[in-house]
């Protein structure tokens, strides 16, 4: 979907997970304003605290901003959600999340 579709979704329903996650992820994919991506992805994680991909996207956005100490607990929470069985998937992202945590130091 085009980024404008996600912006419309957020404007119409600011507390909607899909709009917030989609917009934050799309901003990341486009290499745009990572601060804005963090804003939307934080809301997405608050709305669905066991959505593994949202944790991964937020962790990547924080890391891109050099905010490594903020990124690590976000990534660890995503790993915990995936490995505890509380999430509906996302286990395939665990190796990438662990690798990013190691890279962050």
How would you label these PLM feature ranges?
Residues 12, 46-47, 81, 85:
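Structural marker of alpha-solenoid helical repeat scaffolds
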